[in-house]
Amino acid sequence: MPKSSEQNNESVVKSILERSSYRNVESCKRDILAALHHYRGLQPRQQKYVFNDGRSRDLICLEGTIPVPYKGQSYNIPVSIFVLDTHPTHAPICYVRPTSEMRKYYFLPYVFIFNVFKPKN
């Protein structure tokens, strides 16, 4: 990654951490910058996260793509990774953000078994 991009990421992360209520700022900054250096398709931004109980917080979100090797190929998978304000005590919350072009295949064992053993009329 070019130096200017790394410096920009560092200033964005530092700015978000200064405006937020992260408990362990240095650990967060170090781990986030390491992730951004390793996965160059990610970008830091501040984003509101709504928890299951309805509470919301402004968190650092790493958005973009990460390369995932599968059967000899590398696929860039779009993700959103929310770094909690309690990091490193609690793990980040990660989401895969499929694009409209991604093929979706769902395997539901109950439906499969039902169709295989369905009585024939």
Enumerate the predicted regions with their spans.
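Strand-helix-loop interaction patch of compact alpha/beta domains
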Residues: P2, E6-Y75
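Compact alpha/beta protein-protein interaction domains typified by the UBC
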Residues: S56-F117
